[in-house]
Each structure stands twice: as structure tokens, then as C-alpha cells.
UniProtKB/Swiss-Prot annotation:
Residues 35-105, 503-575, 966-1010, 1037-1077 are annotated as: Disordered. Residues 35-53, 966-976 have a biased composition (Low complexity). Coiled coil: none annotated. This is Constitutive coactivator of PPAR-gamma-like protein 2.
Length: 1091
């Protein structure tokens, strides 16, 4: 887009507008100015009388009173920026002094503060573009760089620079087209990287930098460790960064995004040019002087919104402006001949467009009349002219939001953020009462967001807010510290229906859910997500299927917002190819069924932790929108041995979805309700959308994925999982996490086998080992992961920097990328399950280094060294590796069968049209585990469907009757016939014979057999009704199938016993298990018929 190329244009074409600066010197200058202003305000009137000494420019200021060590700036102790210092703490400690001896020292003056956009500054926060990133990440080197950066900012004497980092946490649905193009470019870059490493064995060039998997979360955890204030955006990241910048009075913005240059930011610094000196005394970068930029372009600052709208952006893309851009160049331009290429859309170069558009904008007589400007811009357009003009006006208004106003108001935002799933204005704070049982709280309106308390202490054993409930005063009360906190207002409610900014950020692509799907719940802790069984029944009965919640049903292959008619698409412009007349939204969204209701307490906690950067960013969006975006990692699309990361860890994400929506308890409640009402009821599947890009999968369309439940036990609801304080709740959190990662075995929680800080790594490796599509990790590769985790070199980044690797291993690079993608999924599962693993044990720098892994993999693979040599000759480390390997491989069948002919993964399931394959098979595109059957009705014995292969009845070995199946088997293999045997060799057990049945005994008494069958079935059904879900009256026909491996003992067996006290729904019946048929009853019927 033209906007994205604006920053590069500034750096190359506007040399006078880019000046080098030292941020640390600027911070000290700001601090001295604030001290002088503070002393000038405190001087008595006598000091200002004639003849009194005054502070003039160039003279030394009066010495300030001595400050306590705790008041030196925003950072203390040299350990990084302090997140907990507040003047109230100082007065509390020094308030015991007798009055008159020592006056209370003044509060520390706020130093310079810079807001960092982590979305565009990740390469610099990682430590630069060093070449070792291709190995999977050198996390201890990154940790050392961030530590040096924080110590350099903590300048002694109160003249430090405070850094506040904002991470992107929104889905960015309005920028999906831009995200899709970026994913395609990253996929191409990944292929270049893999090819370069495979051919030359050297690191790729710096220009091919691709962020290592899980980089954003690793940087976030590292900043939390150094007590840097961390926040996450919720919807539109750019506008929220600007709003946060304005509301909290920052002195500068450090980023690398062209849109910030057009947002009228007072002090905009380049994160791309950020450099920290080796001694930590200088932190240099480039500052963009936008006043000089406007002067060189001949523009006024007030015309920047129109200029940005006409460059091409996510609202009005380049394709809609191509004809306008070519018309500005004119036929005499040297590049004019490029636009006449046959059937191909060609765009002018970005720098040429910027010059031409700036000249056009400067010539506009009345910039306020957007209708006239829009008609003039699109006067050559022959299709969708009105739509283009409307998009142009929305783009102008989008960029005018932060340009016209000097500061953003506090309260309902005019930015049009969609902060809730209903899209309605929030309730006023005075109308928020206590949550009453059974009363719908989110029926039509969402409560206003709570204000953020000061950052919470991060002790060595903290669990990041998962030890208290929402209603406790110490967690969410507005105390004195909160009132003076500069970030206290960063929880203002954003309203999408305000008149100041009419919803230009929203689109009908993902409409907010209607009142039918609103959150209604009670505060009873035993209810799943706070919803009672009666409410679940009503929700299921009234739930529309594949339907637009707003009433508009989506077509089969058309998104809900694609309002382009056939006649419009058929039109084309004479000179520009037909792409200009088509819809520019080149991604297809799909409307999913309404999500299950989520308790208000859970949503408030999720949003709070999301805003504070204390939670995986997509958990809130899964709960509210049912969507997630999966980043691209380094994958060789020509290598068929290793699956894509998005498919490899999809099963774990599906289990996480089931945990987040409390699917297990919902199923159990539905089954209880079905038993009570004596009606069969199916639990509706929870469908979510995953946006990803890998081989054979375009990022333009999402994949529909269903949530799964654990087969072994019933996971508690999310409210109890997050806010429960009992010891059993902590055990259930850990078991839920282990079950999501398929690592629920006793040895995983045994510190003698798996050290506590290596639990998350071992869970990821065990998950990768269990991939049924083929062997991902060989023996020496698994040992390499474990050996580098226990190596002492892991904590020596200086030695690793000097480590030389002759030739990089291409497979090792892909394995490292898969592993770090698994760490990313494990962080997602850990946060969703209530963070049973403390955040200190989740950080990858305590168990992985990409360069160290490469060096040891070469030794183990090429040189074939022993395990002791792989562990640097230390036998004790080798024994640790062996114990961890045994724990990882416990109960795992390493002899994987060859993958069968698997069904192709459909790119999407169109609304209102049933799929050719069931949703449960979507995750099996590359041979993943077949998920357990969803929505099984286990409540009624005897109500079994007629087998499709038919069956026959044998009495004393004689066939007395046969019946046809419900449908043909369609030649999908030899399915055995169902055989019900009474007496004889079968001894009353249902059995199945291979093929179509034996050739003998074809003749029989048809009439007699039908009577016997009808009476037997009638008696059996009456017996089943009298013993609903009983044990003696159940008829389960044994089918011939491969027996499932015996489940290994769970890590927390006590919980599995406790969850089965009330009913027998926790452990489903597996194939191969036999339930005895009441042979006495069937024999009695048969004997009576023979008589």
C-alpha cells in the first residue's frame, strides 16, 4: 500500500526531515527542565522580589533537596524499570518521622516517557537483525540485550527514560487483506531461507529476516521480568496506540510504521534505527520532523488525512486508486506505458505516487468538501463509484481522528472500537450492580470496562493474577494508588455506536452476535460458564444454524459483506484491467454459529489480563469472537516428512477451545437434562475460525475447527478453573494443561524425572512425538533437545556468540521452528487453563537456544557422538536426559502405522450447506489424531441407530432372521454384519463377522424370525426405559475394530476419581469394550417361540 511506503520515502527522499537523536540525552534534558519548573513554582514570593537571586538560562539551578534512593526515577536498583513504585509508598515509609525535624521529601518528578510499539519494533527488541535468528532464536542473547536496554534507561539521579511497550493484541479484521499479503510474502521468504540454508549451509541475508516463532510472547515475558510496563491493544492497534499516547502524555513514540507518521505524533522516532552503545551510555535513533516533511511536500498538516486516504490504505486499497494514480501521471510520463500491460493490474512506483498525490492535495481548493473531492478523484471510474467515494470519506475520517484533536477524551471513545461482541453502547458505571443468580447480565449491553489497578507484583512464585477472584477488593478496587496512576484511565469503554466516528472500523464481515447469543449466566460456581441447564436448553432450541445473527443469511460461496452484483463485476474500465471493477476485499469470511455464553466475571478477567499484557492475546478474542490468527514460521513446503505447524498443533488448540467454552460440563448438563426429560438431545458443536497460511492453504479464507473435550475426565467450567482457590482447583488446572498437550501421565509431574522448569518443554516434545502421520523426532533429535536444555552453555550467551557452526542443518532449522511453535501453543494452553505453570517456567531462555541446538544436533546426527559426549562429558546430565526421555516416551507407541489415504482438508464450509466430510475430520488433513466423536448421546440404552451393514439373529447357532441396513456401505471396505447370537457359541454376546456373512444358513423361517426380532427388541426397549443409562439393560453391539491402547494413568488420579463420584459420564465407552447382553431374556423369548 502507498501508506506503508511512506516511511521509506521519508528516509530516502526527505533527508532534512530525518535527524539523529540520543534518547537518553533528551530524557536528561526533559528531567532538568521539569526540575527547574518545579523549583520555580515552589519559590516563595520573597525570592522573586527585586534583587533576589534568580535562575536564568545558563546558570546552575538551585540544588534540589536530597531524594531517597527509592525515588530515583521510574527505575530502581539497576534491575530494570520498576512497575510498582509510587509516591504513596515513600510517604508511608517516611511518615513516622516527628514533625518539624525533617519535612516530607517531595515526590519524584516524572521523567521522560517513551511509548514503544512492539508490533513494528520486535526486530530491535529481539536485539537486532543478527543472523542467528534462523536457528529458532537465541533467547538468552535477547534477554541480555533487553537487560542492557533497561539498565541504560535507568539513569541514576532520576534522569532516566521510562519505556512503556504496547503489544498488538487485536484480530485486525479490517486489515485481513493486508495480513494475507504479508503472510504470502513471509511464506515466500521462508522458502528462500530454507533453500539458502540447504544449498549453502550459511545463515540467510539480513533482508530475509523472519521473526522466530513465539517472538512476541518471548519479548513480552522478558519485559515483564524486567518490570517494564506492558500493555496490549484490543481491536485497532494503531488507533489504540495513538489514544494511549495522547491520554498519558508521552514524550515520544518509538515505532516503524508509516501510519504513525501521518497521525500527527509530536515526537516520532524510528525503532528501525535504534542503536544501543556497548557501554550503555547512548541510545540513538532517528526522529522524523513532520513539519519539515509537510514543507518539502508542499502540504499543510491539516491536509494529511486526505493525503493518507489517497495514497492507498486498508480502507481504500491501491486497486481502487490505480486509475486515479495513473491519471495524475498523465500520458506524457515516462512510466505511462506500464499501465497498458495486457490483463494485468500494474501500479505506479510508490515514490512517484507520493509526489503526485501531494501535488494534487495541495491544489485542492476546499479540502473540507469531501464529496466534491471524491467525485473528482473517481471521475474516471466506471464501476462502484459511490462505494469508492464512501470508502474515501471513511479513510479521511479514520486519519482525521488523531490529527484534528490535540488529546483524546476519556470516556466513551469516538474511535469506534468494537470492544464487545454485541456492538451496543456500554452500561454507565453507576448502573453496574452485583451479579444476581440467574439474571442475564449481557442480554443487550456489556458493562463498562473497569479501571486498571497499578501493576501487580511479579515475585519469583507469582502466578499472574490467577489466585484471586474478580470480586475481591484488592484486585479491582480503585484505591489511592490507582487515582494517581498515569495509566489508570487506560480502560475506558469504547463505543462502536457513537456519532463522532461512525463505525468506519467495523465491517459486516464479522457481525456482532445478536441478542439470541448474548451472555446470560448466573453466579453459581457449579454451572458451566455460569449458564444453567434450563438456559442451555433454550439456547439450543433457539439457536440458528449457519445463519447471520443479524438476519442476513450468507450465500454458499459469498461472504456476508460482499455486496457486488454480477452486473457490477462484469463491467470493466477501458484502460485499466478488469481487476479494478471487482471487489477489492480479497478475503472470504464465513459466519459461524453463535458461541456459547460466557460468564461476565470470566470476560472481565479476560479483558483485564489482556489489556495488561498478562495473557495470551487471542484468548479474549476466542471467547468473544471465536477467531484466531496463526503466524507463519519457517517451513519447507517441499519436505513431506514434517507437517505444517498450524496442523501439527491444531488438536491441542481444539482442546483449548473446549476448555475455554466449558464444553465438557455443557455436555454433561445436556445429558442430565436429556435423561430427566427422556428425550434424545444432541449437544451443538462449538465452531471456531482459524486464519492461517501454509502449503495448500490460502490466508484469504479461514478454516472451521470444532472444539474438543477430553475423553478421560470432565474438565470444570472456566470460571472455576480460573478463579478457584482450592487445592483441587490447582490440580485441575495442571491436569487440564497436561491433557491439552497430551501429556497427562504421572511421570511428567515427578520432579525426579522432569525438572519443574523443563515441564513445558517436555510437554511440547511429547506432543510432537505422538504425531500419528509419521515420525517427527528421531531418537538423536529428541536427545539433542533435552541435552541442550540441561547444558551449562545455555546461560552463557557470550560463549554462544563465539560458537562457530560450519554448516547449518536445514532439518534442524525446521525442527526448531516447529518446537517454538509448540511453545507458543503451550503458552496459549497454559493461560487458558489458569496458568498452572508459573510464567517464570514458561520462558524459553531457560530451556532452549537455537544456536546451541544446531551445534549439538550436528554432533548427534553427523558425528554420531554418544549421549555422554552430547552432554559435554557429564554423566549426571546424561542421566537427567535419559529420565526425561523415558517420561516423554511413556505409553507412546513409536511404531507409527503408515498414514492411510486421508481426506483432503476443505478450505471452508459454506454456510447453510452441509460438508461432505464431518467437521471432526477437518484436523486430519495431515494424519492427525482423529478427535473423539462430539455430541454423543450416551443417555438412552437401546436407542441405537440401525447399523448400516445390516445384521442377522442366530439362535443356538442357527440363523433365524436377517435384516437390511439403514444405508449401503458404498463400497468403503468390508464392514462386518451385525450378529445377535442367543445361546450356542456366542453365549448371548453381540458379535460381528467379517464380510457379508457366512454362505451357509441362508434359509430360515422369515415369519418366525421377524416375530422373534420384534419381541426381543420390544422387551429390550422396555427394559432400557426402566433402567435409563443403566448397566444391565444396555445392548451394545461389538464392532470389529483395532483396539485402542490402554490409557495410561493420569498425572492427577485423585481428580479423576473425584470427577466420577456423581455420575458415570466422565469416561466414555471406547470401541472394543463389551457390555453383556441379558441372555436370559433373549433365550426365554426364543424358547417360547420354539414351543
Amino acid at each position: 500500500m502507498g501508506v506503508q511506503g511512506f516511511q521509506e520515502f521519508l528516509e530516502k527522499r526527505c533527508p532534512g526531515a530525518v535527524v539523529p537523536v540520543d534518547l537518553l540525552k533528551l530524557a536528561r534534558t526533559v528531567s532538568r527542565q521539569q526540575q527547574q519548573q518545579h523549583l520555580h513554582r515552589q519559590l516563595p514570593p520573597a525570592a522573586l522580589a527585586p534583587g533576589a537571586p534568580r535562575i536564568t538560562r545558563g546558570s546552575a539551578p538551585l540544588p534540589p533537596p536530597p531524594l531517597p534512593p527509592a525515588a530515583f526515577g521510574a527505575y530502581s536498583g539497576g534491575a530494570g524499570p520498576s512497575r510498582h513504585h509510587h509516591p504513596a509508598h515513600h510517604f508511608h515509609h517516611h511518615g513516622q518521622a516527628p514533625p518539624g525535624l525533617h519535612p516530607p521529601p517531595p515526590p519524584p518528578l516524572p521523567g521522560a516517557r517513551v511509548l514503544v510499539d512492539a508490533g513494528s519494533a520486535l526486530p530491535r527488541l529481539y536485539g537486532g537483525y543478527q543472523t542467528d535468528w534462523v536457528c529458532g532464536g537465541q533467547w538468552n542473547a535477547m534477554l541480555g540485550y533487553l537487560s542492557a536496554l533497561c539498565q541504560a534507561c535507568a539513569y541514576p539521579g532520576g534522569d532516566g527514560l521510562e519505556l512503556v511497550v504496547m503489544f498488538p493484541g487485536g484480530l485486525g479484521k479490517d486489515r485481513l487483506a493486508e495480513w494475507g499479503r504479508r503472510c504470502q510474502a513471509e511464506r515466500q521468504t521462508a522458502q528462500l531461507i530454507v533453500g539458502h540454508v540447504g544449498n549453502k549451509g550459511t545463515p540467510p541475508p539480513r533482508a530475509w529476516f523472519l521473526p522466530p516463532a513465539c517472538l512476541s510472547h518471548c519479548v513480552r515475558l522478558a519485559l515483564i521480568r524486567f518490570r517494564v510496563k506492558v500493555f496490549q491493544s484490543l481491536e485497532d492497534h494503531h488507533l489504540e496506540v495513538v489514544a494511549f499516547f495522547r491520554e498519558n502524555g508521552f514524550h515520544g513514540l518509538l515505532a516503524h510504521d508509516s501510519e504513525y507518521a501521518l497521525y500527527n505524533i509530536p515526537s516520532y522516532y524510528s525503532s528501525h534505527a535504534l542503536k544501543l552503545s556497548w557501554n550503555g551510555k547512548n541510545l540513538t535513533t532517528n526522529q522524523f520532523l513532520m513539519q519539515e516533511v509537510a514543507k518539502q511536500l508542499g502540504l499543510k498538516r491539516m491536509n494529511f488525512p486526505i493525503f493518507a486516504a489517497l495514497l492507498g490504505n486498508h480502507i481504500l486499497p491501491d486497486e481502487d486508486l490505480a486509475a486515479f494514480h495513473w491519471s495524475l501521471l498523465g500520458p506524457e510520463h515516462p512510466l505511462a506505458s506500464l499501465k497498458v500491460r495486457a490483463h494485468q493490474l500494474v501500479l505506479p512506483p510508490c515514490d512517484v505516487v507520493i509526489k503526485a498525490v501531494s501535488e494534487y492535495v495541495s491544489s485542492i481548493k476546499d479540502p473540507s468538501n469531501l464529496d466534491v473531492v471524491g467525485k473528482d478523484v473517481f471521475k474516471q471510474s466506471q464501476s462502484r463509484t459511490e462505494d469508492k467515494i464512501e470508502r474515501f470519506k471513511k479513510a479521511v475520517e479514520y486519519y482525521s481522528v488523531t490529527t484534528k484533536l490535540s488529546s483524546l477524551p476519556v470516556g466513551p471513545s469516538f474511535l469506534g472500537f468494537r470492544n464487545n461482541r454485541l456492538g451496543n453502547p456500554p452500561l454507565p458505571r453507576n448502573q453496574m450492580g452485583p451479579i444476581s443468580p440467574g439474571k442475564p447480565m449481557f442480554s443487550r449491553q456489556v458493562p463498562q470496562k473497569m479501571k486498571y489497578p497499578p501493576p501487580f507484583p511479579m515475585g519469583p512464585n507469582s502466578s499472574l493474577l490467577f489466585s484471586h477472584s474478580v470480586g475481591e477488593s484488592h484486585a479491582f478496587s480503585e484505591d489511592a494508588m490507582l487515582q494517581d496512576n498515569s495509566f489508570a484511565n487506560w480502560a475506558v469503554s469504547y463505543d462502536s455506536n457513537t456519532s463522532q466516528f461512525p463505525n468506519c472500523l467495523t465491517s459486516k464481515t464479522s457481525p456482532p452476535l445478536g441478542p439470541d447469543s448474548s451472555h446470560s449466566s448466573s453466579s453459581d460456581g457449579d454451572e458451566a460458564n455460569g449458564a444453567g441447564s434450563e438456559q442451555i436448553t433454550e439456547a439450543v432450541q433457539q439457536q440458528p444454524g449457519w445463519e447471520d445473527p443479524n438476519g442476513d443469511r450468507g450465500a454458499w460461496g459469498q461472504p456476508a459483506d460482499a455486496g457486488v452484483s454480477e452486473t457490477t463485476v462484469a463491467e470493466s474500465e477501458p484502460h485499466i484491467p478488469s481487476l479494478l471493477s471487482m471487489s477489492t476485499r480479497n478475503h472470504m469470511d464465513i459466519t459461524i454459529p453463535p458461541l456459547p455464553p460466557v460468564a461476565p466475571e470470566v470476560l472481565r478477567v479476560a479483558e483485564h489480563r489482556h489489556r495488561r499484557g498478562l495473557m495470551y492475546p487471542y484468548i479474549y478474542h476466542v471467547l468473544t469472537k471465536g477467531e484466531i490468527k496463526i503466524p507463519v514460521c519457517i517451513e519447507d513446503e517441499c519436505n513431506m516428512e514434517l507437517p505444517p505447524a498450524a496442523l501439527l498443533f491444531r488438536s491441542a488448540r481444539q482442546y483449548v477451545y473446549g476448555v475455554l467454552f466449558s464444553l465438557a460440563e455443557t455436555q454433561r448438563k445436556m445429558e442430565r437434562l436429556a435423561i430427566r426429560r427422556r428425550l434424545p438431545m444432541e449437544v451443538p458443536s462449538v465452531i471456531l475460525k482459524e486464519w492461517s497460511a501454509y502449503k495448500g492453504k490460502s490466508p484469504q479464507t479461514p478454516e472451521l475447527v470444532s472444539a474438543l473435550t477430553f475423553r478421560e475426565w470432565t474438565c470444570p467450567n472456566l470460571k472455576k478453573l480460573w478463579l478457584g482457590k482450592a487445592v483441587e482447583d490447582k490440580n485441575r488446572r495442571m491436569r487440564a494443561f497436561l491433557a491439552c498437550m497430551k501429556s497427562d501421565t504421572p511421570s511428567m509431574l515427578n520432579p525426579a524425572n522432569v525438572p519443574t522448569h523443563l515441564l513445558l518443554m517436555c510437554c511440547v516434545l511429547r506432543y510432537m512425538v505422538q504425531w500419528p502421520g509419521g515420525r517427527i523426532l528421531h531418537r538423536h533429535e529428541l536427545d539433542t533437545f533435552l541435552a541442550q536444555a540441561v547444558s551449562t552453555q545455555l546461560y552463557e550467551p557470550d560463549q554462544l556468540q563465539e560458537l562457530k557452526i560450519e554448516k547449518l542443518d536445514a532439518r534442524g532449522i525446521q525442527l526448531a521452528a516447529l518446537f517454538m511453535s509448540g511453545v507458543d501453543t503451550a503458552l496459549f494452553a497454559n493461560d487458558a487453563c489458569g496458568q498452572p505453570v508459573p510464567w517464570e517456567h514458561c520462558c524459553p531462555w531457560i530451556y532452549f537456544d537455537g544456536k546451541l541446538f544446531q551445534s549439538k544436533l550436528i554432533k548427534a546426527g553427523r558425528e554420531r557422538v554418544s549421549l555422554v559426549e552430547l552432554c559435554d562429558g557429564q554423566a549426571d546430565l546424561a542421566s537427567k536426559v535419559e529420565k526425561m526421555r523415558q517420561s516423554i516416551l511413556e505409553g507412546v507407541n513409536m511404531n507409527h502405522p503408515p498414514p492411510s489415504a486421508l481426506l483432503p482438508s476443505p478450505t471452508f464450509v459454506p454456510p447453510m450447506v452441509p460438508s461432505l466430510y464431518p467437521v471432526s475430520l477437518y484436523s486430519r488433513a495431515m494424519g492427525s489424531f482423529p478427535p473423539p466423536p462430539q455430541a454423543r448421546s450416551r443417555g438412552f440404552a437401546g436407542l441405537h441407530p440401525i447399523p448400516p451393514q445390516g445384521g442377522k439373529l442366530e439362535i443356538a447357532g442357527m440363523v433365524v432372521g436377517q435384516w437390511a441396513g439403514s444405508r449401503s456401505s458404498r463400497s468403503r471396505g468390508s464392514f462386518g454384519m451385525q450378529v445377535v447370537s442367543v445361546g450356542g457359541p456366542g453365549k448371548g454376546h453381540g458379535k460381528e463377522q467379517a464380510g457379508r456373512g457366512s454362505k451357509g444358513h441362508k434359509k430360515g423361517n422369515k415369519q418366525g424370525s421377524s416375530d422373534v426380532i420384534s419381541k426381543a427388541v420390544e422387551l429390550h426397549q422396555s427394559r432400557a426405559r426402566s433402567q435409563v443409562n443403566g448397566n444391565n439393560g444396555t445392548l451394545i453391539v461389538e464392532e470389529k475394530s483395532d483396539p485402542l491402547p490402554a490409557p495410561s494413568q493420569c498425572a492427577l488420579s485423585r481428580d479423576s476419581n473425584e470427577c466420577n463420584n456423581s455420575d458415570d459420564h466422565c469416561l466414555p465407552v471406547k470401541n472394543g469394550e463389551k457390555n453383556h447382553v441379558p441372555e436370559q431374556e433373549l433365550e426365554a423369548v426364543a424358547q417360547q417361540k420354539e414351543e
